[in-house]
Amino acid sequence: MKIALSGKSGCGNTTVSGMIAKHYGLEFINYTFHDIAREHNIPFSEFYEKEIIGRNDYYWDKYLDNRLSVLSRKNNTVLASRLAIWISKSADLKIYLYAKMEVRAERIMTREGGMYSDVLSSTFIRDENDKKRYLAIYNIDIDDYFSETDLVIDVTNINPNEVFELIRDEIDKRNLKKNS
């Protein structure tokens, strides 16, 4: 069984993907720019500004997405990333989590701290930067996810447990099983 889960920052991708992986005994794949920044001992905000936005060659995007593409070929995985539903072509179930920007900013603020207005602004800017980069690199419009997904869940007013239950119901309905 292969599950691919995408959504913008603050939608609960990591949390819900981890819950799915644990419940079904699947490998959880979630390698992000945060991980790369940690590996290089650089604060994420600095890494993002200098290495993601500050470069014109998209090196780190390609590095990250290539690594995720290779990992997505494995069986019995849950891949969580912004582009998971586009990267994991062979996923048995492709899920997109959606939430209003204000709710996502609130969640990010709770997780990372900061002032709401600053987090809201940086969330908007990050969304716009992500959209521009993915269009430039892959010709992917991350706001046009319906054609790539089997299931879209608006998580604006529901918690991770409720999201997990909706996904579990879909997995059970499709009779998806862990491969031996």
Curated annotation (Swiss-Prot):
It is an enzyme of class 2 (transferase). This is Cytidylate kinase 2. Signal peptide: none annotated. The lineage of its organism: Bacteria, Pseudomonadati, Spirochaetota, Spirochaetia, Spirochaetales. SUPFAM superfamilies: P-loop containing nucleoside triphosphate hydrolases. It catalyses: CMP + ATP = CDP + ADP; dCMP + ATP = dCDP + ADP. It is found in: Cytoplasm. It comes from Borreliella burgdorferi (strain ATCC 35210 / DSM 4680 / CIP 102532 / B31). It comes from the Bacteria.
